[in-house]
Amino acid sequence: GTAKTQKVDAGTETDLYLPRIYWTQDANTLAFIRMNRLQNQLDIFHANATSGESKLIISETAKTYVDLDYNDDLQYLSDGKTFIRTSEQDGYKHIYHHNLDGTLIRQLTSGAWEVSSMVGIDEKAKKLYFISTETSPLERNFYVINLDGKGKKLLTPAKGTHTINMSADHKFFIDYYSTTDTPVKVTLNDATGKELKVLEDNQALKERMAGFALGKKEFFSFPTVDGTQLNGYIIKPADFDPNKKYPVLMYVYGGPGSQNVLNSWGGSRDFWHQQLAAEGIIVACVDNRGTGARGRDFKHSTYANLGKLETIDQIEGAKHFAKMPFVDPSRIGIWGWSYGGYM
């Protein structure tokens, strides 16, 4: 056949981004995303591949910014009539089902929690698989929901953090599961969540850890002066004595959409923090405003003002620790890497 280059009409404005291009199920329809320079407007277009003509399908605006990277989930279903996308337009990242012309069929998920990632769509069974923070912002669990928005079911009831790899036919999934004191356990499960086989239990590491006196990582939340609830953790020495006064080292990252306070295996950094705890230093961490898993307003509160609210919240954290009867308030330090170094 002959190849012909066809320019697509993306509008007359030149100061913009065209960050994503997708084929729909129709070989003659190309989808592309257009964003303005400020990234507070996201437009989805469908273009005719033969003529280059394009049509605006959906336009989403925000007072702050539209987070394309976090909502990079546009998927055209094989029925050729509909597509699925995610959006934070109602304040939390949720899943939406649209007709090809952009009209909304339904919002599939809703609530004061986030869909952290889409895992798969079983079109034959009309089921959609996703991971969310519904149980807690400190956890990640795997769910299935019908495309009619009904029958939502939790597939991974174990508390902690689940990362999922699902087979292309949606009959099986591999679950990478961990908590703050349990290293990653990998299991093969059927689509109902039933465990079929343990692929890795990290038994050797667990046995090795049993030989060390490790302090427990405790999660907590506290209100700041303006009433914002912040999540944190504290690691006390294994031989903790509540009558002693301990120094505290705060660990911070705190960048937009990030998260340090999470019920998952912490790896080598946690072991370093355990080493400090063994030396008699309490290690503590607070996820300030601007961090993730708490919804759009919490994450975007630092927009165009990086460093201000984050610093206030870390100071609030330090004051919170200073009030603890076993803390020496004259010996509170802080360290951070990258954005945490900037903090």
Describe each model-derived feature in a short phrase.
Residues D43-F45, H94-Y96, N141-Y143, K185-T187:
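A short loop-to-beta-strand structural motif that recurs across blades of beta-propeller domains
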Residues A3, Q39, Y92, D181, ...:
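Coil-to-beta-strand transition motifs
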Residues G1-L18, A47-D72, N99-D122, S132-T135, ...:
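Multi-bladed beta-propeller domains
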Residues T12, Q25, R34-N36, S51, ...:
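Short, flexible loop/turn elements at secondary-structure junctions
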Residues Y22-Q25, Y70-D79, G120-K124, M166-S167:
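Structural signature of eukaryotic scaffold interfaces centered on beta-propeller domains
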